[in-house]
């Protein structure tokens, strides 16, 4: 709905990609194209978003993003927003409330305590994430039709 309503022009999907058989951003992109009908040219994968801190820093420094609408699990939204804002990214959040409150959801909620402690350490220590070179994917997606 965010793309079709014009609230966003490009979608940056971020996650881990340790092997060719496990590709979180690739899976997200396929879902958005096949199920939501979003043009593939408007979806940019970040395959080095190993954690929320890396994702926020990379969005700003590698992809040139200055403001973002974060869509994430409800239990993760506050930490994601705080992380992005503390790393210089102007962000607002939209929680995904569609996930059932099953064992996976409760596990995710439970690990938030440790994840929040790690986030504080990352921000305070200014940990340098895996960056790589700049990526023009977002700029190119903005210019595509």
Predicted features along the sequence, with ranges:
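A transmembrane-helix-recognition feature enriched in membrane-embedded lipid enzymes
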Residues: 106-128
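A general structural signal for short secondary-structure boundary/capping elements
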Residues: 92, 114-121, 137-143
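The feature marks non-catalytic terminal segments
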Residues: 125-145
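A structural signal for short, hydrophobic/glycine-enriched beta-strand patches
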Residues: 1-109
């Amino acid at each position: 709905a965010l793309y079709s309503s014009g609230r966003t022009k490009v979608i940056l999907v971020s996650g881990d990609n340790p092997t060719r058989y496990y590709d979180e951003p690739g899976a997200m992109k396929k879902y958005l194209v096949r199920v939501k009908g979003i043009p593939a040219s408007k979806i940019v994968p970040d395959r080095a978003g190993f954690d929320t801190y890396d994702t926020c820093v990379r969005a700003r420094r590698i992809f040139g993003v200055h403001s973002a609408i974060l869509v994430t699990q409800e239990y993760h939204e506050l930490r994601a927003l705080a992380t992005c804002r503390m790393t210089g990214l102007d962000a607002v959040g939209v929680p995904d409330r569609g996930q059932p409150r099953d064992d996976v959801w409760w596990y995710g909620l439970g690990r938030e305590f440790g994840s929040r402690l790690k986030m504080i350490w990352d921000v305070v220590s200014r940990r340098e994430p895996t960056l790589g070179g700049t990526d023009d994917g977002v700029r190119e997606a903005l210019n595509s039709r």
